[in-house]
Amino acid sequence: MLPLKEKDKPIIRKLLSSGCCARCVLRFCCVTLQAAYRKPPQDTLRELRAFVHDAENGETRESAEGNGETPDAAAAAEPAGDPPSKRAKLERVGTGAAEEEEEEDAAVEPKEEEPSVCVSCLGVLQELCGPTHAVKIAERVKAEKYEFDTLLLSVSLPAQLCVREHSCWLHVKKEMREKSLAVDKDDLVQVKETFKWVMQGAVAQELGGVPVVIRSLFEVGVEFTHPETDADCHFLATACASCFKSNRNKRSVFTRMAVVKALEKISDAVFLKHYSSPPAAPTSSCSTENIQCLHLAIFVAGRYNKFSRSLPQTPWVIDGERRMESSVEELIAAPVLSSFRADGFNFSSSGREDVDVRTLGNGRPFAMELLDPHRTKLSHVEMKQLQEVVFITHSQSIIIIISFPS
């Protein structure tokens, strides 16, 4: 059973007739039970329709009882020996009453199926929030060949979803005002949170049970776009120009934060002047622009001894021309990057020496920040082998002692 309340009935009617999907209806009803969103959308839609339909039947029965009548009593009140009246009643039941019932059901149950594309989430909580998409995400993660114990699932949504959600909210708000009910917009469940509630378990299952947590060194980011409705935000540049400032480093001034800020500033009247409520139905769903995997940096530390008098600590390039063939940094980095399968690195050391100065004694401490490593753990044996690779390859130049990261 869905955790719905009496005050949710008009919201459900309003949103279903406006083209919202079942999960978005739950969001606007402020349902925070995660299990409710994990149900198949068709089952949820069926329960929503049943909830509203049963409520209306209950109201009808209460009205009849208040008038001191029952369906059987109303039927018995009709004179038995009056065929014309009976015929009229049968005709009314067979035609007019049936039509009224169909119209009433149509208002609450606009479609047997969910809308092809939800007017609020643009399909993010429909086909893109299910087993098929979970398989797609998992396949991308497996293809990248990362090693990880846990993962964090993040979502990037198009900014126009904020505009559409606000439009649906105003649509519901009007209904609530007429019925003297109060609902706070801050209590609405966000699309991003709903997506995570549904997909975290599904993705984890596809990856063999790897825990999907709220904090992890390994992140899987899913980015959605919807070019068809990009223009939904454009009116805000006029309605609240101060919120949108040109930035060369950004592809668009209509960032999610800027749109949210603008919606908070403008009045309902200004919004409704430029944008319809409820929003217009789209013809296409959101598409997955990118599924990106990223592991936070890890650090490898150690000490090095340098015996060569012609080896700089870092690459020596002057006016675009390389002066030395190699450097301490490069000699250490090459095998380390290969072992950890990292995309890049940052090298730092405790001080530095001139090219013609040797580093003796216990060696100079150094650290390497490995960017987006696909491997994060090496055994002590593997670390020893890595040390030997550097030593054997460059025995005339450098000795390296690498500490295993704790």
Give the label of every model feature segment:
Residues 1-406:
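RNA pseudouridine synthases
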